[in-house]
Amino acid sequence: YYASRGLGDVYKRQAFHMSNRMHPDYYVYDMITDILSNGRSSRFIQSLVQEQKLFTSIDAYISGSLDEGLLHVTGKPVEGVSLEQAEKAIWKELEKMKTVPVSEQELEKVKNRYESEQIFNNINYLNVATNLAFFELTGKAEDINEEVGKYRAVTAEQIQATSARCFVPENCSILYYKAIS
């Protein structure tokens, strides 16, 4: 789908269907997006921004609650890079997630980052209250204490298998924003 907007730039968004927040795969999807785009050493930043210089910015993130969610990939191609070229490069990186296992070092780095973010987030009482309210909504307030363990339990094999199920054209909706001339 193509949309035009008067902001003078080009933008690409892909959305893949994924599980809801209470499904065990939710943690796998979250780790996948962290591997792809969380930090300067993430795959998208290293390959698509720094090495190939195809994007000025690119991100992968999940949205989901009690309903089924989406795994989003959004990016702004460098001027002169076509949307088709940008899309092809993203699919190539997603294909690697399906075919090449994540290294233990890369997986441990993402797990450590998540755990440290949780520790720092729990310093703020508002964050704790918000998270506790969400888990109370699900009927399992005590699950708030299990989050880090659920992320720590994610394996490279789960990441590869979930990527293989998720990153297929039939599971993807694509939106291109084109600048109005």
Indicate where each model-derived feature is located:
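Single conserved hydrophobic/aromatic residue that forms the stacking wall/gate
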Residues: Y1-Y11
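M16 family metallopeptidases and their MPP-like homologs
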Residues: K12-S19, Q46-T99, E104-A153, E170-A179
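Active/ligand-binding-proximal structured segments within catalytic/core domains
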Residues: Q14, P24-L36, Q46
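Short, charged, low-complexity patches
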Residues: D25-Y29, T33, S41, L83-E87
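Short, conserved catalytic/metal-binding micro-motifs enriched in Asp/Glu and His
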Residues: D30, I159, I174
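Short beta-alpha junctions and helix-cap segments that line functional grooves
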Residues: M31, A60, T162-S163
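Low-complexity, intrinsically disordered Gly/Pro/Thr-rich segments
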Residues: A156-A164
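Extracellular/periplasmic catalytic domains that process cell-envelope and extracellular macromolecules
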Residues: C166-V168
